[in-house]
Every structure is written in structure tokens, then in C-alpha cells.
Amino acid sequence: MVKIMKKKKIIVAMSGGVDSSVSAWLLLKQGYQVEGLFMKNWDEDDSNDYCSSKIDFNDVKKVCKTLNIPLHTINFSEEYWENVFLNFLKEHKKGNTPNPDILCNKIIKFNICLKFSLKYLKSDYFATGHYAKIKKTKKNFYLYRAHDKKKDQSYFLYTLKSKILSKIIFPLAYFKKKKIRKIAKKIKLSVYKKKDSTGICFIQPKKFNSFLKQYIPQKIGKILTMSKEFLGLHLGYEFYTIGQRKGLNIGGKKKKKNAYPWYVVKKDIYLNIIFVVQGLRNPYLLSYGFLTKKIHYINDNIFYFKKKCVVQIKYRQEPIICEFFKISKKNNYIKVIFKKPILYVTPGQSAVFYLKNKCLGGSIIKKNIPYLP
């Protein structure tokens, strides 16, 4: 009697975008049993003006109908609120600029949602439309940059461990974005023209401040130069980030005959003061390193690679060579020094370390080390 091999079942996290939609099609083409899962992390009843989940869900339904695959839905809005959004607010109140998408990947998407797929939907693997690669050795699974370096999203995935990576598939690992859109058009997916999502996973960047004001009260404070010259008033330090230019409302202010734009360089959260400097290349905007406390390793201890390692402190930023130094056993601080000073090192953001295209792990920036004191 011929033994029939059962198809591997893969649950694809469907966002309503072109990437996750084509990911599902690619897996179908490879012969897997594919089912879609729409994950809702935000209740639009709380904020109709900001959340697009209704539109996204309708797009997912259309795609699943076209592909003829089952669609599951799950609401993780309570888990998201407790584990991601409250942390997001807490960090803003500390004067930091957090990245909730990274925390969402760690706690919601590749933890709670992954476990739900494996346990309750009986899947063998969990797939998403991220641009990243997973490579396997005899002992471990490793995270690498995607073939499309412009779209690479490994920066947002550095918190994942080898055990988690063993259950994940990234179908777009070796594809360029242009190719994905061409495929979507060719197979007549309704989302082939849909714009890529930007900003936080539940809100568009243009509406960010008005959204944040619902949860953090405005507190009028001073905008000062580094020499303590008064330039104007701001709405509260929580609404500004290091390197910010827009929204300061001091564009017409000129110091001497210098008409360069102003940038946020420092925040005093106790006195509610925003400090600004003029000019994109102002040395006050530069840092030669940062302090962090805990580094997450995907597999290998980063200190083994400290002379070869590069660090990326923002999404799509050019990585820079760095070195590591343990400077205090008491508070466990680690100092990371760049080969050359760089702009806008922002507390609360993630610093992700690479060995060539291999993602080693990362950490949260606790404090920048300014080029000028």
C-alpha cells in the first residue's frame, strides 16, 4: 500500500497588504496547505479616525476568496494594550522614543499569535510577509537580511530566538518588492496597488501626535537653544523626538543671520524643556556611541564578534562599525562605541547588530553618548 504524505499546514498572518497576500500564494504554489489568519490588535471603536482594521479585514477576505483558502480571525487587542501599548505610553513619559512594532513582533505576533496557530489551528509553521531570511544549520536557526536590502525588515525581528525561528517561514526572503507587486497583479489580487503601511501598526504617521494627545495630556514648556536662549513654546516633551524638525513652529526664528532649520537635540523631562540647534550637521546632533543594559542574542554572544560587528540604530539606516565595552558590574551597563560619530542616536530606539548580513541580536538604547558635552 502506498503511503500518502500529509501536506504541511501553514498559517499565514494576513494583514491586507500585498506582501502577506503574495506570501500565501507562494506557499500554495509550493504545495502547502495554506490558511489565512487576520489578527486584530486595536479596537477601532476606541479610535475610528486612526485605525484601518476594517478596511484591511475586507481586503484580506477578498484575497482569501481569490486564493480559495480558509480565513481565521483572532482579536488580540487586550493583549496588545497590556503588553505593547501601555509600554509605549510609559516610554514616551520617560522622554524616550519607543518602537512598538518590535515589541509587537516579540510578544504578540511571534509569541501569542504563533502559539495560537500551532496549538489551536494545528499548523506546522507560521508565515508572514516580512522581508527577511531564516537559515538553518545542524544545531540552530539564524536570521539574515532579505535579498531586497531596501525592504529588509530583520531590524524589527532581532528579538526572536532560534527556537521561534524554527517554526517561522518568510516566503519573500529572496524576492524584490517590485516582483511581488508584479505577481499580485498577474494573479489578479485586489490589493496589488495598495500602498505599503508605514508608522506604528495601528496608526499612520501623519496622525501620530493627535492620536497620542488622547492618552498623554499637553503640558506647555519652553524651547531653548543650547545657550539657553528662549525661542518659543512646545506642547510637552513627550510629543518630540531627537532629530525632529517638523512641528516645532519656530521655522521663522533666525539666530544672527543663520536661516538653517532647527532640530530637537535634547529633552529635560523634569523641567519640560526642549533644546534645539540649527543645521542638520550641527555637532550637538552627533553621538559617538550609546549605553545599553541588556543585549538580546538570537544565538551567538555578540562579544565574540565585537571587532567585526556593525550596528544599525534605525530602520533603513546605514550600519556602522562598533565596539563593545562592559563598564559597570553594579548596573550592568554596556557601552557601544561607533567607528565615527553619527546623527540622531535616540533613547528608546533599538540598536541591532549584524555580522555582514547575519542578524546577531540587539538592544534598547538607554542613553546616547554625545559628541559635544
From Swiss-Prot:
The record marks 130, 349 as: Interaction with tRNA. It comes from the Bacteria. This is tRNA-specific 2-thiouridylase MnmA. Its main location: cytoplasm. Belongs to the MnmA/TRMU family. One of its GO terms (cellular component) is cytoplasm. Its EC number is 2.8.1.13. Residues 99-101 are annotated as: Interaction with target base in tRNA. GO terms for biological process: tRNA wobble position uridine thiolation. It comes from Buchnera aphidicola subsp. Cinara cedri (strain Cc).
